[in-house]
Amino acid sequence: MGQEFSWEEAEAAGEIDVAELQEWYKKFVMECPSGTLFMHEFKRFFKVTDDEEASQYVEGMFRAFDKNGDNTIDFLEYVAALNLVLRGTLEHKLKWTFKIYDKDGNGCIDRLELLNIVEGIYQLKKACRRELQTEQGQLLTPEEVVDRIFLLVDENGDGQLSLNEFVEGARRDKWVMKMLQMDMNPSSWLAQQRRKSAMF
């Protein structure tokens, strides 16, 4: 599911100072004494239990962070991911989001891939209905969100979103940006987790 982010993207997001890195390491080791974060722990952080769509979405994020594909997140992968999420530019975050959405890794997002992601996000964001509404306050179904995104972003009408269409569509339209990035509100999520857990 999805592709991995590159170390170059994480590095381009900004440098981490040594003191901050040491603090992250202490917290990581306290929470993950084995030195690795497993899928079930990752899901627990997102409070994902039995919901299939939300579970698939979180698994996609996990795989995007799991650079070497060993089904765990080690400290270096953790740091690279946090650096990208917390400090990355809008373009880096959109590229990373695109890679999560592109489940089959073919470089394009089709309607079914986007629908699966939007359904998962709806499950994760049940309490945040505001984020799922249009400018007029209308709550759209996942299918309506996908239709509207394709209408606004699929420039060549081929039924697939390329990376360029994805990034440019988000830059052009505020609503599209909100919909394409509604999973990428990691700063507030991480702030909540910092209060609840020593992990972050």
Curated annotation (Swiss-Prot):
InterPro entries on file: EF-hand-dom_pair, EF_Hand_1_Ca_BS, EF_hand_dom, Recoverin
Domain EF-hand: 14-31, 53-88, 89-124, 141-176
Membrane topology, record value: Lipid-anchor
Keyword list, A-Z: Calcium, Cell membrane, Cell projection, Disease variant, Lipoprotein, Membrane, Metal-binding, Myristate, Repeat, Retinitis pigmentosa, Sensory transduction, Vision
Binding positions (Ca(2+) 2): D102, D104, N106, C108, E113
UniProt subcellular location: Cell membrane; Photoreceptor inner segment; Cell projection, Cilium, Photoreceptor outer segment
Further details from the record: Binds three calcium ions.
Name of this protein: Guanylyl cyclase-activating protein 2
Species: Homo sapiens (Human)
The gene coding this protein: GUCA1B
